[in-house]
From Swiss-Prot:
It is found in: Cytoplasm. It comes from the Bacteria. It comes from Photorhabdus laumondii subsp. laumondii (strain DSM 15139 / CIP 105565 / TT01) (Photorhabdus luminescens subsp. laumondii). This is Leucine--tRNA ligase. InterPro entries: aa-tRNA-synth_I_CS, aa-tRNA-synth_Ia, Leu-tRNA-ligase, Leu_tRNA-synth_edit, M/V/L/I-tRNA-synth_anticd-bd, Methionyl/Leucyl_tRNA_Synth, Rossmann-like_a/b/a_fold, tRNAsynth_Ia_anticodon-bd. GO terms for cellular component: cytosol. Pfam families: Anticodon_1, tRNA-synt_1, tRNA-synt_1_2, tRNA-synt_1g. A motif ('HIGH' region) lies at residues 42-52. SUPFAM superfamilies: Anticodon-binding domain of a subclass of class I aminoacyl-tRNA synthetases (SSF47323), Nucleotidylyl transferase (SSF52374), ValRS/IleRS/LeuRS editing domain (SSF50677). The keyword Transferase does not apply. GO terms for molecular function: aminoacyl-tRNA deacylase activity; ATP binding; leucine-tRNA ligase activity.
Amino acid sequence: MQEQYRPEDIEPQVQLHWQEKQTFKVTEDNSKEKYYCLSMLPYPSGRLHMGHVRNYTIGDVISRYQRMLGKNVLQPIGWDAFGLPAEGAAVKNNTAPAPWTYANIEYMKGQLKTLGFGYDWDREVTTCTPEYYHWEQWFFTKLYEKGLVYKKTSSVNWCPHDLTVLANEQVVDGCCWRCDSKVERKEIPQWFIKITDYAEELLSDLETLEEWPEQVKTMQRNWIGRSEGVEITFDVADSQEKLTVYTTRPDTFLGATYVAIAAGHPLAKQAAENNPELVAFIDECRNTKVAEADMATMEKKGMATGMFAIHSLTKEKVAIWVANFVLMEYGTGAVMAVPGHDQRDWEFATKYNLPIKAVILDNEGNEPNVHEAPVTDKNILFNSGEFSGLNHEAGFNAIANKLVEMGVGKRKVNYRLRDWGVSRQRYWGAPIPMATLENGTVVPVPADQLPVILPEDVKMDGITSPIKADPEWAKTTINGQPALRETDTFDTFMESSWYYARYTCPDYDKGLLDPAAANYWLPVDQYIGGIEHAIMHLMYFRFFHKLMRDASLVNSNEPAKRLLCQGMVLADAFYYIGKNGEKIWVSPADTIVERDDKGRIVKATDKEGHELVYTGMSKMSKSKNNGIDPQLMVEKYGADTVRLFMMFAAPPELTLEWQESSVEGANRFLKRVWRLVYEHSSKGATQPLDITNLTVEQKDLFRDLHKTIAKVTDDVGRRQAFNTAIAAVMELMNKLTRAPQETEQDRALMQEALLAVVRMLSPITPHACFIMWQALGGEGGIDTADWPQANEQAMVDDTKLVVIQVNGKVRGRVTVPADATKEYVHDLAAQEYGVAKYLEGVTIRKVIYVPGKLLNLVVG
């Protein structure tokens, strides 16, 4: 061990050792408890960012800790390699997506290795390789055969810039989540997987995920959106047509005064045949904002169709309107409007001067003035004929039953969740394994013709997918008949929905999964990723697992037992106004700042002298140019320091503020540990510690050591509060640096303490701990060392500090043996000057003793 801590010397040396010894390679071993720790796989964008580093450091710390508990730990890594960014980069760099992607993977793989992550690299998967997507295509054809896949023309969210379909979740404020272009509505044929068949199970099984964040489960519950209600059929006046609506409030049915239908509803099309104004309005609706958040806040617009529905109970005519807030994709494409008891319906009725009727009393039990505001609470019914006087639940059931008896109603459970549209009109994705025969029949590509390989040597024009532009690529033969291949590719969420299972058997060539390997490792014990994936990836991830279970590929119901959603990494952001009024963002690395006495930034300039506006801490991003390159930090401080800072700066689920001064602090701490280990080990071997023959000071330090082990074990294992675990080790280190080293027992105790400190830090700072363990003469290598065990007896205090009160007021404190009697403590307390003066000339009427904590003398 060298005297100075130089990570640039030791880290490559330790990483080479891991590589040569294949330290983290694992196989199935039924004699050991397994532990599968997984961080969400990265997209190979070109360089790691600090968000990656935080995610993967958390995963590596958990994995290394579990190894030290003696478990058979799988920690794999791979690449979510398909996707739009590769197409944009290929056009920009005049190349194809494949070489750009593979080059990025190689570079980022090197970055991961320099950070010391303990991956089993033999299990690496790259989702854009035929070896991977072969089995995805095969599974899709099996789902098709089971009736879980279908194709239909549907109205979709269309990004005119990326020329592709967006899921509702990918529309943010009416714009594309990726490029911010305004989203349009478009009718195109799409492939869908029936996730709605699993809606109830996806919802109910959330209850079994006890170690998932409640926030994620709530987001999924809301997205699935289960509701119980009634489907009501109206007759259309002067027509043979019927109109069906779904409502969760049948108790308000007597207050329905109009019906709103979607622009794509058959009745809307029928009404528009001789109405050019309605045609124009329907066209406007097709390009309206489509995300649900937008639906809630946008201006409500409508137009009368001139048609009327017949109210099923009152037989009154209610007008049918086309409204921009009703979508064909949700429910029946029509809603009954009760403006007296629904805010949206009320706004619409007020705007267009439609009737508003009250049928629910207000919270005080009075008849409300619904022309001023709607009453949306579930109160007592009135003005509802035979149903007046019923409460919400009774009214719901009575009206529902009546409609069912009349044959115009049907109780129904509805879900907000829509089927998963998996078609994308881009090139860089896995080809959808379907084909169309000359007679128009659509068939799956047979298993012996899979995979349908995506050509990688292509020219990108940035507009048309190369496989759509090349008519020859689509030509194929299915069972001897000419056919045309599907030229759409899979949504990239397909690849990331099952990669975790493929890690268990990455080289298996007889099917999607090797059931023996998959069922040894699955479910994942610990999954780590951002909260932003709660309702897309994490929903599809759960859905795919259930599909694989029902195909007898896995035995478990859920893919992951425990989920940790790490917070974002924030950094200072600065800009100045350019010549054309635009914001020019300046990297924190290129700024000079002045701070006040509280450390707050009060002035900032860049290296060219521009005075900068400081906008505070925000998520590291390219748009604000405030990303910090992990590579530069590793080169400057070493991987262990970066890892230590990431784990210490904040609890893992909260945002982390990047402060280089704090990184320097982490580096100083590591140097302090290194120096103490060096000084201790350079004095030679120590004798075994005799715990039966310790001085009072040695006992105190021994007790502190084992209390620290207990706390760190709980913080890392159960609480995942890594920052407080590190703080506890730092506190112990402060005591160790002050501990006397005069006797053999002193040195033996220091040896035991440092062996424990190095083991507790090794999941976080593995390179330095590898070397320090060797220097201390630790048994075997640190990579096979056991986690230190807390000695329960050692943690018991020999003495207690007892608070002394007189008439309930604190007057002193005394240190007593842990087993001291009330009489002993009383006698000792009476001799304390601070207590004794309050006992002069008074009578002690009562003595209250809480053993080891408090003595209260009641005097009078």
